[in-house]
A protein has these predicted regions:
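Conserved SAM-binding motif I beta-strand of class I
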Residues: 72-77
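Conserved class I S-adenosyl-L-methionine
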Residues: 47-57
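A short acidic, Gly/Pro-enriched loop at the edge of an enzyme's catalytic core
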Residues: 107-116, 120
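A generic alpha-to-beta junction signature in SAM-dependent methyltransferases
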Residues: 45, 69, 90, 135-141
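S-adenosyl-L-methionine
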Residues: 78-110
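Conserved SAM-binding loop of SAM-dependent methyltransferases across substrates and taxa
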Residues: 58-70
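Class I SAM-dependent methyltransferase Rossmann-like catalytic core
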Residues: 1-49
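C-terminal substrate-binding/active-site "lid" region of AdoMet-derived donor-dependent transferases
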Residues: 81-82, 124-189
Length: 189
């Protein structure tokens, strides 16, 4: 079953789903990520201008992106329930454009951006992002992405220019087990 077809459960501090076979919770996003999301948003917005956010989740990074001096904020989200939350969140935010769909399926409808933040769950095309990332970026644009590992083991295969190291204290979850988070940074020239 694809992620976009799963029934998600939203509460104040998490998004998760229950695996039908194992009956285990699979966490999609949790509120302990705030400082990571702020750092990603601040880097993605470091040039101002037009920002592309792939994945909305709980809207944590979107809130931080909106706190920056930006021109536009395009959000691509594949899960219909998360997209509905994004539409509600974007009400009265005229610089926000929400696109329902997988980034790979809508890639030719996207423009050029000064900054990009990629953080999705269950993206079967994630490893292809490295091939398309340059086509989304303006000259001197910057990109960052969720990194579940470390600076030597980047699951997307994108070569970062540098990393910021953030101390974290993750709650019990099934997607991040470390006390240090390596935030990847990439500039396009």
């Amino acid at each position: 079953m694809e992620f976009k077809d799963r029934k998600l459960i939203f509460d104040d501090s998490t998004i998760y789903f229950i695996d039908k076979d194992s009956q285990k919770k699979h966490f999609v996003m949790m509120d302990w990520e705030h400082n990571i999301m702020k750092a990603h948003a601040d880097y993605a917005c470091s040039n101002g201008g037009d920002i592309l956010e792939i994945g909305f989740g709980m809207g944590i990074s979107a809130n931080y992106i909106q706190q920056n001096n930006i021109k536009s904020h395009t959000i691509v989200e594949c899960h219909p329930a998360v997209t509905n939350n994004a539409y509600a969140w974007a009400e009265n935010k005229p610089n926000v454009n929400i696109i329902l769909g997988d980034w790979f399926d809508v890639k030719y409808h996207l423009g050029l951006y000064d900054g990009l933040f990629y953080d999705t769950y269950g993206d079967t095309k994630a490893k292809q992002l490295k091939d398309y990332l340059p086509t989304f970026m303006k000259n001197k644009g910057v990109a960052t992405w969720w990194n579940s590992y470390n600076e030597k083991n980047n699951q997307l295969g994108i070569k970062a220019d540098s990393y910021s190291i953030i101390d974290v204290n993750p709650k019990n979850n099934n997607y991040f087990k470390f006390n240090k988070y390596y935030l990847p940074k990439k500039e396009f020239k």
